[in-house]
């Protein structure tokens, strides 16, 4: 099989699909677990009002919580993976719904935890630690809860908010079902008149084509179709930010941004400093756009011209087998123990590889490492897909290390550091590929791809982050997120970030309709901060070798054992300053100069 053929999910060869039997042997076993999990709320209720009674009671509660965490994580993981393999399958969608309902029910059953732990006097808690040394394992979790004391409500209110958790997932679920399962796009033709199937999964690969007619036709057809449903898309985003505002207000935060970042202990200034730093380096982006226009030799550079490789004849087809081999070579610098786990993942079907009819688009790694993570891909046999592979395996290795070396309560790393490991893998792959060739055209092609990573990850994700911030402010001021308002704001940002050399086509005003991360609660800025941190970390690994690798594996194994900014500081990267962003964008400028010299 290759990345060009789109089959029904039932016809995809087994070797390219997940082996979910590592989690549950069958759907029936999953159903048995559903019944078993129903016993937990009663067991949890027995601890209500008692967490401050004794050290033993508190330890017993945390032990039970760990047990539930592992079982529920596996339970949700299995159902989510099943439903994402075929989003149109009503049985698996029902399974997913049951899984999330159970997760919400258990969260609700344990909602008294935060307020009760908050209420334990400092001197009593100190005595508990002295009486029961095993409680030290949970000190970090306890400290995180008590840090947010001003935002934790009464047990009754916490139970209501926990029960509302399922409702808060509705905008994301509705968008995902509509966008992935229900949306259909017209076929498009290339310069030769050949017909191509346009899907959400084939859209970007078409924009990467050297055929400008195909790029333009795909671009216009995709957004024409999206425009027909722009009010539906706007409605789901409006609901998303209204639910964020509801929870932020309920917990007495000043903004939806503050509420979202506080959960992961990231200072708000990290977010705003990123936007300011990128604004201060937009001149480099404008230089990149001008160079792209010059090399492509077009009178006007349009938004459908931003993905196609500048050195078109250097574009190569990379099979999944070749992508795996190259990934192992590039990441060998991280040690044999690292690549051994990668090989295990490849051999034991931790990955669902190719796009198929009804499969969820994009790529992701599940956040559960018990027994191991799973990775979803939509591999297209190109360079971008190879980078996606190492990116998602970076997530997988981060999850695997944290779940292996951290206790359950500190195994789940926060989003802010999640993208560092994945992006570091991408940087190491790029350095590996550049180190293998002196060919001017091949180097130019790779550097162009590297520059596109800067554009797509640092600049583009910061633009998304700024758009999210604008949506949050709209919701906070009571302004409705209408399709017209969103499109106007998005088009203005696109013009700011790409500059006057780029034609910001009217269609691009609707790009917000296709971005799933806008439903992830201020997630995307972390791609940009992580990219900046990853550049610094990868450079240190390549420069210092074993000592840096040793520190890096401590980072991978750190889970949430420290605040995320502190985990990065241990690697020598301080994201509370603009230095990492400025340094990364300085490299961007140097790469522009090198590409310009290579291509004359």
PLM-predicted stretches and their roles:
Residues 329, 333-340, 366, 395, ...:
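Conserved helix-loop functional segments at active or binding sites
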Residues 316-320, 368-390:
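Short pre-active-site segment immediately N-terminal to the catalytic Zn-binding motif
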Residues 295-339, 374-375, 398, 445, ...:
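Long, K/E/R/D-enriched contiguous segments that form extended
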Residues 1-50, 70, 74-269, 273, ...:
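His/Asp/Glu-rich acidic catalytic environments and adjacent acidic regulatory segments
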Residues 316-318, 351-371:
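Catalytic zinc-binding patch centered on the HExxH motif and its immediate surroundings
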Residues 252, 380-400, 422, 427, ...:
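Active-site recognition of the HExxH zinc-binding catalytic motif
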Residues 413-442, 450-452, 456, 530:
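Post-HExxH zinc-binding segment in Zn-dependent metallohydrolases
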Residues 10-14, 25, 113, 117, ...:
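C-terminal, non-catalytic "cap/extension" segments appended to globular domains
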């Amino acid at each position: 099989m290759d990345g060009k053929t789109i089959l029904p999910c039932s016809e995809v060869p087994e070797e390219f699909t997940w082996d979910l039997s590592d989690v549950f042997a069958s759907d029936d076993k999953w159903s048995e677990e559903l019944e078993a999990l129903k016993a937990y709320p009663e067991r949890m209720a027995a601890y209500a009002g008692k967490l401050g009674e004794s050290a033993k009671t508190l330890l017993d509660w945390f032990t039970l919580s760990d047990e539930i965490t592992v079982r529920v994580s596996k339970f949700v993981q299995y159902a989510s993976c099943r439903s994402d393999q075929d989003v149109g399958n009503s049985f698996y969608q029902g399974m997913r719904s049951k899984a999330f309902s159970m997760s919400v029910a258990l969260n609700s059953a344990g909602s008294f935890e935060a307020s009760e732990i908050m209420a334990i006097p400092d001197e009593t808690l100190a005595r508990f630690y002295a009486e029961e040394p095993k409680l030290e394992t949970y000190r970090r979790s306890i400290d995180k809860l008590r840090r947010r004391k001003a935002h934790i409500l009464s047990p009754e209110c916490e139970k209501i908010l926990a029960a509302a958790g399922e409702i808060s997932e509705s905008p994301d679920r509705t968008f995902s079902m509509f966008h992935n399962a229900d949306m259909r796009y017209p076929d498009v033709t290339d310069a030769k008149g050949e017909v191509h199937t346009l899907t959400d999964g084939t859209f970007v690969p078409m924009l990467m084509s050297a055929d400008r007619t195909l790029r333009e036709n795909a671009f216009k057809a995709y957004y024409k179709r999206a425009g027909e449903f722009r009010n539906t898309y706007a409605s789901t985003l409006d609901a998303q930010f209204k639910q964020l505002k509801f929870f932020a207000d309920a917990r007495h935060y000043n903004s939806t941004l503050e509420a979202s970042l506080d959960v992961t202990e990231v200072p708000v200034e990290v977010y705003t400093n990123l936007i300011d730093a990128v604004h201060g380096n937009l001149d480099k982006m404008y230089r990149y756009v001008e160079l792209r226009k010059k090399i492509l030799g077009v009178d006007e550079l349009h938004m459908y011209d931003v993905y196609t490789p500048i050195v078109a004849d250097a574009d190569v087809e990379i099979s999944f087998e070749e992508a795996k081999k190259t990934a192992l070579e590039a990441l060998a610098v991280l040690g044999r123990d690292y690549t051994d786990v990668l090989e295990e993942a490849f051999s034991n079907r931790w990955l669902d590889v190719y796009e198929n009819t009804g499969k969820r688009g994009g790529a992701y790694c599940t956040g559960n490492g018990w027994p191991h993570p799973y990775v979803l891909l939509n591999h297209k046999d190109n360079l971008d897909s190879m980078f996606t592979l190492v990116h998602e395996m970076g997530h997988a290795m981060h999850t695997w290390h944290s779940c292996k070396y951290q206790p359950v309560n500190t195994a789940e790393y926060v989003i802010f550091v999640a993208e560092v490991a994945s992006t570091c893998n991408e940087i190491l792959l790029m350095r590996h590929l550049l180190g293998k060739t002196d060919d001017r055209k091949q180097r130019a092609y790779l550097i162009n791809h590297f520059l596109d990573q800067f554009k797509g990850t640092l600049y583009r994700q910061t633009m998304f982050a700024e758009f999210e911030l604008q949506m949050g402010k709209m919701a906070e001021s009571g302004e409705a997120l209408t399709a017209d308002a969103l499109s106007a704001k998005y088009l203005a940002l696109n013009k700011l970030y790409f500059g006057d050399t780029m034609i910001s086509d009217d269609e691009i005003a609707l790009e917000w309709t296709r971005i799933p991360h806008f439903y992830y609660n201020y997630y995307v800025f972390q791609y940009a901060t992580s990219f900046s941190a990853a550049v610094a970390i990868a450079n240190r690994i390549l420069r210092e070798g074993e000592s840096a690798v040793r520190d890096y594996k401590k980072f991978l194994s750190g889970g949430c054992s420290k605040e995320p900014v502190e985990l990065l500081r241990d690697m020598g990267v301080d994201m509370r300053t603009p230095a990492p962003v400025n340094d990364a964008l300085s490299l961007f400028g140097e790469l522009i100069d090198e590409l310009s010299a290579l291509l004359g």
